[in-house]
Amino acid sequence: RQAPVGGNEAMVPISYETRVAADAAIAAAPRSQAAQGDQDVALTPDPQTGNGWHLQALRALEAQGVDVMRAPVTVGIMDQSVDDTVPDLVGQVDHDKSVSCSFNGIPNRDPAAWRWDDATHGTHVAGSIAAKHDGVGVDGVNPTLRIAAINVASRNGGFFYPEYIVCGFVWAAEHGISVTNGSYYVDPWKYWLPNDPEQAAGQEAVQRAVDYATSKDVINVVAAGNFSTDLDNLPTTDDSAPGDTWGAHERDVTGAVYMPPKLRGTLSVSALQLPEGADPATGVLEPASWSNWGATSVDFAAPGAKIYAPLTSWYGKAYGNLYGTSQASPLAAAVIATLRQVHPEMNAEQIIALAKKQAGDPANWDRLKPVEGREYRGAGLPN
């Protein structure tokens, strides 16, 4: 699947020639006063960083310039793969903490197993979090974070099966990974029925794996999904599954669970878009039309439309825009991981409380446009 989370996710690659021409103009242009903020250290963004409105929305560039002690923190990218050969990710991926779980859920540390150049989703996610600050390309939200590639998708089709997901959470728990990002839903069922003997074991196994990671102080951030669905009131019928073979059929899904956003121990993130003409640093943001929502099911709302980050080497020296809650959740994960850097004395529960407190600050909360009958904001905008 091109869109691991599912729904209306899309990619818009930017040609190398266009980027080269843009680099010179962007590098020569001064940063806006709104984006500069109160910095302790002068920071010149990488040339194409101006394409990333999300960095201004999260005040990420200001945070990068703050001179503060930062503890080492690794974010686990539970996704298709991460191509650490692209320029902005060279040196950002910790090979000792990276793994593929995509063969029967058995860990394989061979880089060839977790580094694919023909599946760009995980690379884009990793780059949006931690693309390095090196004078070329773009900046991630926090280039000082480390990345662990945790491949939890099949090579053919990009399916995310329970045994792969279990392997990923257990690996993160046992290898010192502080935060995971999960931009996917669990295959082959869109909605898992806990009373169906063919589905109950898979659902329970994934829930136990999340519980295990939580017990090891891991914070697990996940995409809310792209089906324009109220996660508080899931549909009672579905005709999209099983999704990995012919024969999808309508079935009763009353009482089903949508994994992972509805699992205990996950933080679910909905997607925001920038209205035309709005200032990304100060303007009011609105929910993307395709984003899932839910007053009790969503924890944060973060930018998820037109998110600019690196693509795999298969595309050449390329960057591109992706759209989806797959892009929103890594931005929230990056903010949470930054809090873990700055507050190593805090446990996961305390960090989550702090992240929600900051997201709900009026300076952040008031930027989220309320929508009647569609509560998508969670605690607010991570910052």
Model-based region annotation:
Residues 2-74, 82, 87-88, 92:
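Protease zymogen maturation seam
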Residues 32-33, 70-75, 143-148, 174-180, ...:
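Loop/turn elements at helix/coil->beta-strand transitions in domains of secreted/extracellular proteins
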